[in-house]
Amino acid sequence: MARQRADRFDEFLPLLDKLLTQDSTTEKGEYYSAVEARNIPGCVQQPRAPFYVAATGPRGLKLAAEFGQGWVSYGDPRGPADVPVDQAPAVIEAQLGRLRSACEAGGRDYAALNRVLLQGSTAEQPLQSLDAFVDYAGTYQALGIDEIVIHWPVPDSIFANDLAVFEQIAAEGLAQLG
């Protein structure tokens, strides 16, 4: 199942790139096909609309280096419950190292690739307080993460957090990171 997902992704991203950069695309793949698919009026941004690639495996990181304007980590593929809080930064650091290697192997400037972490993908609890967020964001910023996506608090869900803390983070937290 995982191999098939990777195979599909490996076929999909190059096709998506063609669909967004060519006036007409014809492609016959194992999973996806397009016959004279037209892109009208085409992308306003050139060469195409940017996309970010969320992947942590070797093939996905290679695709991120080749096609993405950004890379997204959703943490350890095993899930946040399986990675102790004190080990979570090391997991992301290792992923960033593999991404850097994929960029180097593909002739891509690693620094030009935006790097994003989805909060909630690691076991840390950065939305417990302003200080917790600043520590969390500072840790990942130091590792090379450019952006952190945090979830709006949703009561009675995995995203149940204090709205007042969330608003304080938005108002004051980012300024503390520099």
Model feature map: region roles:
Residues M1-G178:
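Active-site-adjacent structural elements that line small-molecule/cofactor binding pockets in enzymes
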